[in-house]
């Protein structure tokens, strides 16, 4: 089910200020708003003020609202009048980032799904996603960066993108060596869902342009690609039962298994520590990593590892 987008578009009379140039987008840029306003308020303020600063979408915990047409540029990345961020990227603001908490976590989760939707609609891969910092060095998206989670957010977008393809379109068994292209397929999506690279599929199928594949076309797969997902899951065994923060703290092999799997999914217990915080101790930082994983996976974000969290982790590994 696609995520609906409400439109509150800037008046054409303000195009010269907010979005003066025609645009054929090539990237999606993620921002944090650095305040606690809703998406509706963000867009209303953006289109109503006299500043040139602008962006295409605002996402909060409830909805996605569009403020600029996608065929017009926005001034949102700080890389100058002709910079590719300002001239060729779609700006997505994630709301409630100042205070964080459950509302921000829900907004981020919705933004992850929405960015994946934008990628799917355009046949793009995760390589099209950028953070504001990439264009001009600004420390944005500030909350994601301060929590050391940019890689995690990108991984979550990619999982969402590839998961949709895998669930709906990958009609091959784990032992299959070819794939029949269906309506809506992209080569990047096929590659990701079978553990291969686009370049590999281009090479073994003699495909010159990866953006041009046809419905019904047979795509040969590398011999080991279709088995990669099951291999990845078996490489990260997860314990049964419930693990949470206790006094004294729970320790041991089971905790280390959970931490190792979290790190493999880019949800590091403590990215700056030795082994990214994989120490076999279920403390507040590990609970926070579990909570962050839960918040972007449609689960109750309580920081408690249990059967539902285990199943979702196994699905994503």
Curated annotation (Swiss-Prot):
Fetch the CDD domains from UniProt: LysM (cd00118), PGRP (cd06583)
Q: What is its EC number?
A: 3.5.1.28
Under the heading InterPro entries, the entry gives: Amidase/PGRP_sf, Amidase_domain, LysM_dom, LysM_dom_sf, NAMLAA_amidase_2, Peptidoglycan-bd-like, PGBD-like_sf, PGBDSf
Please give one Pfam family short name.
Answer: LysM
- Hydrolase recorded as keyword: yes
Q: Where is the N-acetylmuramoyl-L-alanine amidase domain?
A: 40-142
Localization: Secreted
UniProt KW keywords: Cell wall biogenesis/degradation, Competence, Hydrolase, Secreted, Signal, Sporulation
Would the keyword Magnesium turn up in this protein's UniProt record?
no
Under Gene Ontology molecular function, one entry of this record is: N-acetylmuramoyl-L-alanine amidase activity
* Signal peptide as annotated in the record: 1-39
Catalyzed chemical reaction(s): Hydrolyzes the link between N-acetylmuramoyl residues and L-amino acid residues in certain cell-wall glycopeptides
Any idea what job this protein has? Autolysins are involved in some important biological processes such as cell separation, cell-wall turnover, competence for genetic transformation, formation of the flagella and sporulation.
**Recorded family membership:** Belongs to the N-acetylmuramoyl-L-alanine amidase 2 family.
Under what name is this protein listed?
N-acetylmuramoyl-L-alanine amidase XlyB
The encoding gene: xlyB
């Amino acid at each position: 089910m696609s995520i609906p987008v409400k439109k509150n578009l800037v008046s054409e009379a303000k195009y010269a200020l907010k979005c003066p140039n025609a645009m054929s987008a090539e990237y999606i840029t993620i921002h944090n708003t650095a305040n606690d306003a809703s998406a509706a308020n963000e867009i209303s303020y953006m289109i109503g003020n006299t500043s040139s600063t602008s962006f295409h979408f605002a996402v909060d915990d409830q909805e996605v609202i569009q403020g600029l047409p996608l065929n017009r540029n926005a001034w949102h990345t700080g890389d100058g009048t002709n910079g590719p961020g300002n001239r060729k990227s779609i700006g997505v603001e994630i709301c409630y980032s100042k205070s964080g908490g459950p509302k921000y976590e829900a907004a981020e989760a919705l933004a992850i799904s929405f960015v994946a939707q934008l990628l799917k609609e355009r046949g793009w891969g995760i390589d099209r996603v950028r953070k504001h910092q990439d264009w001009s060095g600004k420390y944005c998206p500030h909350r994601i960066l301060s929590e050391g989670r940019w890689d995690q957010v990108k991984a979550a977008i990619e999982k969402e993108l590839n998961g949709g393809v895998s669930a709906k379109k990958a009609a091959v068994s784990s032992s299959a060596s070819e794939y029949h292209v269906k309506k809506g397929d992209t080569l990047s999506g096929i590659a990701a869902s079978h553990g291969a690279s686009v370049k590999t599929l281009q090479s073994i199928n003699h495909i010159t342009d990866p953006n041009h594949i046809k419905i019904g076309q047979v795509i040969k797969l590398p011999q080991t690609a279709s088995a990669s997902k099951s291999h990845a899951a078996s490489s990260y065994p997860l314990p049964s039962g419930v693990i949470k923060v206790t006094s004294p703290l729970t320790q041991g092999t089971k905790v280390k298994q959970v931490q190792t799997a979290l790190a493999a999914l880019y949800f590091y217990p403590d990215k700056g520590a030795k082994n990214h915080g994989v120490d076999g101790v279920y403390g507040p930082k590990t609970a926070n990593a579990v909570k962050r994983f839960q918040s972007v996976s449609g689960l109750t974000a309580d920081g408690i590892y249990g059967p539902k969290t285990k199943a979702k982790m196994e699905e994503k590994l």
